[in-house]
Curated annotation (Swiss-Prot):
Expressed in skeletal muscle, spleen, kidney, placenta, prostate, stomach, thyroid and tongue. Also weakly expressed in heart, thymus, liver and lung. The gene is RNF135. It comes from Homo sapiens (Human). InterPro entries: B30.2/SPRY, B30.2/SPRY_sf, Butyrophylin_SPRY, ConA-like_dom_sf, E3_ubiq-ligase_TRIM/RNF, PRY, RNF135_SPRY_PRY_dom, SPRY_dom. This is E3 ubiquitin-protein ligase RNF135. Homodimer. Interacts (homodimer) with RIGI (double-stranded RNA-bound oligomeric form); involved in both RIGI ubiquitination, oligomerization into filaments associated with viral RNAs and the bridging of these filaments. Interacts with UBE2D3 and UBE2N; E2 ubiquitin ligases involved in RNF135-mediated ubiquitination of RIGI and activation of the RIG-I signaling pathway. Interacts with PCBP2. PROSITE patterns: B302_SPRY (PS50188), ZF_RING_1 (PS00518), ZF_RING_2 (PS50089).
Length: 432
């Protein structure tokens, strides 16, 4: 099979983050891919694991570990891409014409740069037009998929062999280019074919709605868009934090035991930042130059300053602006290279980007479902040795309850996904 010639090269837009290492925040250098699929600079991994002096070699991204240190091999494909990116970035920064200083393997970049450049305004119009056209095509494709799912839904009850075949057809349709990441985090949990079809239809309708909103927004005049943004909150189904207006709910029945924890800076990971009031923790865009301390977490975690050793305590955490998170409690002696819930002296509920809510207690995971709580209430009753987690968005719903030992003080504990800069958790003011 003949390969593509140089004239058939496909231009691909890459940002530095696409080929970056989350440990050093730079381009990959001698990239090594772990068994979980995540890649890092080899020397960054070795330095990180060496500093931790840990018994398990965990991935800094997904936290999967192994009993023995994995053999690090060079990912030559990633290395080649990173090298090409470096060369292109140097050419752009120097402002030189690549046609006069060709670089091996960068002929497609050189030929593109050697062409006469369009005026910026013409480039912008062409890009906006292509974005609108693509959005319209995606909208039509999703409408077609919605029709397919609805027709399946209206058919007679499926036979035992039917659901797998028909759902596999839908899977092939999705693989043609529709990105389900635009839909709300929702796991297909129904056991019946009808339930699965209903869930797929729900996700498709959400994608359809957002695509239509995107096309409408692109076609609106710029002045009109600015006026609407100033005069009214966004109509998007994913409003910004300061634009959201959650339904009013009654005061929590635990309000009389409410506390207002603040983050402890000594335990704060270098990949996190804390607000001035010490009640908001954010994933940083770059490693922070905090002073080294044996009390500081090597993973993106933080404890609060308040030690809870007796009595009853309640606090709430707003998780709506974080895609992956865990909230719970831990002892101060928790190992700083371990992850919340994976130790005997910590417990938490955790939301994964795979649309799964889990509880971790005594190093065991309990899957709770696929509904994502926007606000989590934590109830710690040390008099009875109980810990409970509630979803308290609009009404109170128990998520998980377990027994705990009060042999040592416990501290509110938090984990955030370190690969999503800008994600944050807020310790809320409990409604009294």
């Amino acid at each position: 099979m003949a390969g593509l010639g140089l004239g058939s090269a496909v231009p691909v837009w890459l940002a530095e983050d696409d080929l970056g290492c989350i440990i050093c925040q730079g381009l990959l250098d001698w990239p090594a891919t772990l068994p979980c699929g995540h890649s890092f600079c080899r020397h960054c991994l070795e330095a990180l694991w060496g500093a931790r002096d840990a018994r398990r070699w965990a991935c800094p991204t997904c936290r999967q570990g192994a009993a023995q240190q994995p053999h690090l091999r060079k990912n030559t494909l990633l290395q080649d891409l990173a090298d090409k990116y470096r060369r292109a970035a140097r050419e752009i920064q120097a402002g030189s014409d690549p046609a006069h200083c060709p670089c091996p393997g960068s002929s497609s970049l050189s030929s593109a740069a050697a062409r006469p450049r369009r005026r910026p305004e013409l480039q912008r119009v062409a890009v906006e037009k292509s974005i609108t056209e693509v959005a319209q095509e995606l909208t039509e494709l999703v409408e077609h998929l919605v029709d397919i799912v609805r027709s399946l839904q209206n058919q007679r009850p499926l036979s035992e062999s039917g659901p797998d075949n028909e759902l596999s057809i839908l899977g092939k349709a999705f693989s043609s280019g529709v990105d389900l990441s635009m839909a709300s985090p929702k796991l297909v949990t129904s056991d019946t074919a009808a339930g699965k079809i209903r869930d797929i239809l729900h996700d498709l309708e959400e994608i359809q709605e957002k695509l239509q909103e995107s096309v409408t927004w692109k076609e609106a005049p710029e002045a009109q868009m600015q006026g609407e943004l100033l005069e009214a909150p966004s109509s998007s189904s994913c409003p910004l934090p300061d634009q959201s207006h959650p339904a009013l709910r009654r005061a929590s029945r635990f309000a009389q035991w409410a506390i207002h924890p603040t983050f402890n800076l000594k335990s704060l990971s270098c990949s996190l930042e804390v607000s001035k009031d010490s009640r908001t923790v954010t994933v940083s865009h770059r490693p922070q130059p905090y002073r080294w301390s044996c009390e500081r977490f090597s993973t993106s975690q933080v404890l609060c300053s308040q030690a809870l050793s007796s009595g009853k305590h309640y606090w709430e955490v707003d998780t709506r602006n974080c895609s992956h998170w865990a909230v719970g409690v831990a002892s101060w002696e928790m190992s700083r290279d371990q992850v919340l819930g994976r130790t005997m002296d910590s417990c938490c509920v955790e939301w994964k980007g795979t649309s799964q809510l889990s509880a971790w207690h005594m190093v065991k995971e309990t899957v709770l479902g696929s509904d994502r709580p926007g606000v989590v209430g934590i109830w710690l009753n040390l008099e009875e040795g109980k810990l409970a987690f509630y979803s308290v968005d609009n009404q109170e719903k128990l998520l998980y309850e377990c027994t705990i030992s009060a042999s040592s003080p416990l501290y509110p504990a938090f984990w955030l996904y370190g690969l999503h800069p800008g994600n944050y958790l807020i310790i809320k003011q409990v409604k009294v």
